A protein has these predicted regions:
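Conserved functional hotspot residues or short segments at active or partner-binding sites
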Residues: 29-139
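Charge-biased, low-complexity intrinsically disordered regions
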Residues: 1-16, 29, 84, 126-151, ...
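C-terminal and late-domain segments of enzyme folds
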Residues: 1-47
Length: 159
C-alpha cells in the first residue's frame, strides 16, 4: 500500500503500473522501454536499504498493454516507511527524458492531464516538459507536507 499513491501518479502516463500482474504498483514498464537503460537511470535514486529494484519484463492481463510484453522495473519495499512519491516522479521523468517520442501523459475526459489531478497542480507537467527542475518540486512538496503534518497533528487518530 505504500507504493499506491506514487503508482497512481505513474498511471497518469502511458507507463503500465503493473495492474493485471502479481505485483501491481510495484511493477512499471511499457513496450517501448529499454529495461537496462531505464533501470540504470533509476538506480541512483533508490535507497537500497529501504527498497530493492530489479529489471522486469511482464505481460499485464488488464488495463494498459493487455497481452503485450512490457519492459521496465519491479520494486520491493524493505520497510513500511519508504516515501515512494519522489521515486514515482523520477520514474516519470526518466521515461520522459529517455523516450520523448513514446512517453505520453494521459488526459482526463475534460482534456486536463490526469497527472495534474493526481498531484494537485500543473507543476509535474512543467517538470516533464523540461520547464521546472524535479528536485526543486520535490523540495517544495516536502516542505508543504511538513506544514500539513504539523497543522493536522492534533486531529490524527493514527500516528
Amino acid at each position: 500500500t505504500i507504493c499506491y499513491s506514487g503508482g497512481c501518479a505513474v498511471g497518469a502516463s502511458n507507463i503500465s503500473e503493473g495492474r493485471g500482474t502479481p505485483h501491481p504498483f510495484l511493477t512499471y514498464g511499457a513496450p517501448y522501454i529499454d529495461m537496462d537503460e531505464f533501470y540504470e537511470a533509476l538506480l541512483p535514486w533508490v535507497d537500497r536499504e529501504k527498497l530493492l529494484i530489479r529489471k522486469k519484463a511482464f505481460t499485464p492481463s488488464e488495463r494498459k498493454y493487455i497481452g503485450e510484453i512490457c519492459y521496465g522495473i519491479e520494486l520491493m519495499p524493505l520497510c513500511d516507511t519508504y516515501d515512494f512519491i519522489p521515486l514515482s516522479m523520477r520514474i516519470l521523468k526518466a521515461a520522459a527524458d529517455l523516450y520523448p517520442n513514446d512517453f505520453e501523459l494521459v488526459k482526463a475526459a475534460d482534456g486536463q492531464m490526469h497527472i495534474s489531478r493526481v498531484t494537485g497542480s500543473h507543476e509535474m507537467e512543467r517538470v516533464l516538459e523540461g520547464k521546472k527542475d524535479l528536485d526543486s518540486l520535490l523540495t517544495e512538496w516536502d516542505a508543504q507536507s511538513k506544514v500539513f503534518a504539523e497543522a493536522t497533528e492534533q486531529y490524527r487518530i493514527y500516528r
